[in-house]
Amino acid sequence: MKRENPFYHRVPIQDSTYFFGRAQEVDRIAALIANGQSVSLIGPRRIGKSSLLSQLCQPLVQAEYGLVADAQTLVYFSGEAWQDQPTGVLYAAIWTAVVDGVAVVGTGAFPTDLPDPMVETLDFPTFQRALRQIGYPERRIVLLLD
């Protein structure tokens, strides 16, 4: 028996007004993130995974669940258009999203030896080292990879 998808939106829901019925999922995921756990959202296409990630990025939701910027910074990145790109280009794009996300919440100063956020390619060791430098020890960078 095939179930009907309850979501009528054709794109991920960005407006919290239209996001409802997922309080239990948001609560569970936020608790796992706050405790430093990794989380995987798995489900059929267009079931609301991207909308759920978008909801977690809302400042009011983060405040409600204790995901405060001085402890962790949530960074959303959609990989939808990146499947045919070399890994170095993907790492550079994620790095740019991280720098933008940290700049938006305005927590702490950036270390001076980080890669330029406009770099076009980034190898994995440099990407990994940069993530550690920008996040540790003041904050954890939480990547919400869609």
Region roles according to the model:
Residues 1-20, 25, 108-112:
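Conserved adenine-nucleotide phosphate-binding loops and their immediately adjacent elements
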Residues 74, 79-109:
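Conserved NTP-binding/hydrolysis module of P-loop NTPases
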